[in-house]
Amino acid sequence: MPAIQNEIAQLTAELNQHNYRYYVDDSPSIPDAEYDRLLNRLKALETEHPEFCRPDSPTQRVGGEALAKFEQIKHLKPMLSLDNVFDEQEFTAFNQRIVDKTGKDLSYCCEPKLDGLAVSIVYRDGVFERAATRGDGQTGEDITENVRTIKSIPLTLRGDNFPPLVEVRGEVIMPHKAFDALNERARVKGDKLFVNPRNAAAGSLRQLDSKITASRALGFYAYALGVVEPETWELADSHYGQLEQLRSWGVPVSQEVRGCETVAEVMAYYYDIQQRRSSLEFEIDGVVVKVNQIAHQLSLGFVAKAPRWATAFKFPAQEEMTLLEGVDFQVGRTGAVTPVARLKPVFVGGVTVSNATLHNADEIARLGVKVGDTIIIRRAGDVIPQIVAVVAEKRPDDAKDIVFPAHCPVCDSEVERVEGEAVTRCTGGLFCEAQRKEAIKHFASRKALDIDGMGDKVVEQLIDKELVESPADLFRLTASAMTMLERMGMKSATKLVAAIEVAKQTTFARFLYALGIREVGEATAANLAAYFKTLEALKAASAEEFIKVDDVGTIVAAHLAHFLAQPHNLEVIDKLVEAGIHWPAVEEVAEEDLSLKGQTWVLTGTLTQLNRNDAKAKLQALGAKVAGSVSKNTDCLVAGAAAGSKLTKAQELGVKVIDEEALIAILS
């Protein structure tokens, strides 16, 4: 067999196996990007050597075979898939083909490419009759009873202006919130977790017991009309218009659908929704672009398996395969020993990734991952890269278990894992150089003492050269001593000493936050300062007293009590006060001054007249909780210049939105 023919045969067999796992088992073994690469290679070879194209090639059909355990339904007309484009150049070429065939620039309808399971739903005389999966495009699986359980799908159409028979085509998805809840239930039971919402939606839809499907909180969005009878029934003459008709009949249609008149508008839509991707309630992997006018769709027609008038404009891959080459153990500010996977560098989500946290021993056990494994790495938006699965069939014979060290890799102190906690910790405290470095970085950080010029590299050098051992030592530094540091001349050293002096004037809340007590963030520190008002009162408090403070539960109270019971911590606090750190007295706040008590506020965009931290502190002083994200519980969003996805979400949820001028008026 010629080498090319052999490669085509091997690629066909491999892709068919991946198709079966993806469409039938709902258990994909490789990322979408890897599948696309294999498929594109096969397409290229078949184009060059059509005589070797096999009848079972995945390029000759759509999707996978119907499951035998469900009844099979022949579609009223084929459910085809879409061709893909992966960048602006490829989309421009797609548009040019449209222009060449029609002789004119056409408008487009754009919508999110939902990452779920395509289904066909038939209504007869306005009543839900049956539903089927796409299957192989010609025949699908009868999932009528399962789809009937999806609450967003109407069992009867609204109004009376719908055709006697109408087929609705769309995507069944699992919203992020439902996916997280499903996996949390599985985690509690010790069951296997779903890798992503797409797998969860597909697995839920193919349950033989529809009660299980009903418990999974699936969603649905229509993306097209299928067969309509009689064919003479008057429908909108544009794709966008037909989606609006579906919406008027009570069928869910995504609010993200947009009409675009030009290629520039399509590109703007693509980049906008890509930026907002992580804030959407559902998973998407690109944008579907369709010629808007139905007459032009009909004239453009179809190729063998896809319409000429539509394409899927895919986002850069968020998942890739790579090799786990080793594991390093890092020690953080609170002594947490974190396993970090060293990866063979891989480009994913727009960046090259060479490391990924494994979090803790429980996560390693859940993944079943070993050194030497081929793993799937995921990076969505600005989210930290994470390992989501192991490709078990690629495991080498010499793969090694990941074993936590018995002693700290930095200071050799014993490590311990407290019962009920997932984290393993070094017991060395400030004796541990790693913990000292992280503690002092935190102490000097912008939200703590805010020492201008005291960056991470400066702190690391101060520790390495034994100029500083605790935060209190910062206030004994001299300019001449700091000239020992790399790239630190006398002028820079003098400036840094002056910044340290300025940092002595702070607030009680910032001081408490700077101490780095476990679980004590900015908001908790502010609540503690407001409640106790003085350092002496705080030091004298018991765990029972701490629990009386807003947002302080038993765990945080225990951490506070433990921290303040350690002689070396009290010694550091005393030395800091002796060094001259001070703050204005915390004044009693009258109840009438807490005008925002119980409210949740969010800040977004750039504030031009207020420092963001000052605005946050002033809102908290009025009793507000300042959150980092918008939800249905948000009372007000302050939108500065260039506000982004938070503003969009607030508008969708009907949250009150004000500008910076209105905020200043409230705070004055």
Curated annotation (Swiss-Prot):
Its cofactor is Mg(2+); Mn(2+). The active site is at K113 (n6-amp-lysine intermediate). It is an enzyme of class 6 (ligase). GO terms for molecular function: DNA binding; DNA ligase (NAD+) activity; metal ion binding. Zn(2+) binds at C408, C411, C426, C432. GO terms for cellular component: cytosol. One of its GO terms (biological process) is DNA repair. It catalyses: NAD(+) + (deoxyribonucleotide)n-3'-hydroxyl + 5'-phospho-(deoxyribonucleotide)m = (deoxyribonucleotide)n+m + AMP + beta-nicotinamide D-nucleotide. NAD(+) binds at D32, A33, E34, Y35, D36, S81, L82, E111, R134, E171, K290, K314. InterPro entries: BRCT_dom, BRCT_dom_sf, DisA/LigA_HHH, DNA_ligase, DNA_ligase_AS, DNA_ligase_CS, DNAligase_adenylation, DNAligase_N. Its EC number is 6.5.1.2. SMART domains: BRCT, HhH1, LIGANc. CDD domains: BRCT_DNA_ligase_like, LIGANc. DNA ligase that catalyzes the formation of phosphodiester linkages between 5'-phosphoryl and 3'-hydroxyl groups in double-stranded DNA using NAD as a coenzyme and as the energy source for the reaction. It is essential for DNA replication and repair of damaged DNA. Belongs to the NAD-dependent DNA ligase family. LigA subfamily. This is DNA ligase.
